Structure formats: C-alpha cells, structure tokens
C-alpha cells in the first residue's frame, strides 16, 4: 500500500511558512478600512463626503470627467454630481476639454488644492501607522503595493 505524502506548506528562506493570498487578505482589508475611516472623518470635518474628498485628492492634475469617474469607480452622472457640488463651493472648476468642447475637464481651484493638502495632512491615523514602519519597511512596501495596484487595475 502506497501512501501519498502530506503536502507541505511552502516556506520562505528563513523557514517561515509563506503566507497564502488568503492569509494576506484580512490584514490588507484592515489597512484599507483604516484609510477609509480616516478619510471619512477628515472629509466630514471639512463638510465633504468621502467621495468628494477622494475626487478632490485625485485631481492633482486636470482630469477628464470620464477618467475621474473611472478613478472613483462610479458612473459619469455620479462624478458630475460630485464635481458640481464641489464647484459650487469653489473647490473645483470644469472647462471644455482641448479638442472636444463637448467633454469637460475637472481641475482644482487654489482653494481646492489647499483643502486637498489639508485633508492629506490631517489623516493622522494613516500617517501614524506608516510612520511606525522603519525606513526599510516603507522602502520594501512601496513597490509591493504598486505591484498589487497594477495587477488589480492594469
């Protein structure tokens, strides 16, 4: 009678088990939730929804409305409403797209740029968590996060 060998978990060079994708999902979800909660609280202090804050931060360069909608993972009418509410507050402006006057490009006003920087600076929970990492850990983490993002949205 032949018995099948019991499969062994893969191990890293230092003999620790290599985490499976499932092992990584919960800690990753916790980080994402922390970022979302932090952004939501800071946005509310400035009278913005989380989606408006995300849009304001994303507009570090002028962006076609369709690209902003894709970035926010929403439909064009939702992005138009978000931008319209921020435009009313003087945070964003819409201008005709070069070469296609039917399309619009959204960009931040100076007030919008200042608020976007303020929101980022006030996201203390995220900053504190990242500052707790060593320089080497942050240096190692950045390319891994970029690779994950590229895999998800390539």
Model-assigned labels for residue ranges:
Residues 1-46, 110, 132, 147:
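N-terminal leader segment of winged-helix/HTH proteins
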Residues 27, 34, 38, 54-57, ...:
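Pre-recognition alpha-helix immediately N-terminal to the DNA-recognition helix
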Residues 37-78:
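N-terminal helix-turn-helix DNA-binding core of bacterial DNA-binding proteins
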Residues 84-146:
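Charged, amphipathic alpha-helical coiled-coil/dimerization segments
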Residues 150-154:
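Generic C-terminal helix-cap and adjacent flexible tail
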Residues 32, 57-61, 146:
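Short, locally clustered residues in the helix-turn-helix/winged-helix DNA-binding domain
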Residues 57, 81, 143:
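DNA-binding alpha-helical recognition surfaces that contact promoter or target DNA
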Residues 56, 68, 83-89:
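Basic amphipathic alpha-helical segments that dock to polyanions
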């Amino acid at each position: 009678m032949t018995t099948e060998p019991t499969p062994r978990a893969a191990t890293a060079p230092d003999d620790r088990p290599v985490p499976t994708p499932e092992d990584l999902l919960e800690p990753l979800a916790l980080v994402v939730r922390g970022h979302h909660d932090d952004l939501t609280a800071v946005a509310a202090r400035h009278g913005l929804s989380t989606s408006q804050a995300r849009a304001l931060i994303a507009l570090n360069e002028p962006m076609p409305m369709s690209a902003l909608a894709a970035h926010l993972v929403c439909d064009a009418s939702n992005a138009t409403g978000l931008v319209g509410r921020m435009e009313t507050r003087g945070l964003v402006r819409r201008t005709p797209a070069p070469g296609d006057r039917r399309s619009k490009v959204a960009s931040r006003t100076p007030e919008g740029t200042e608020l976007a920087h303020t929101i980022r600076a006030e996201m203390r929970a995220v900053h504190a968590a990242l500052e707790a990492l060593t320089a080497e850990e942050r240096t190692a983490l950045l390319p891994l996060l970029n690779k994950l993002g590229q895999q998800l949205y390539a």
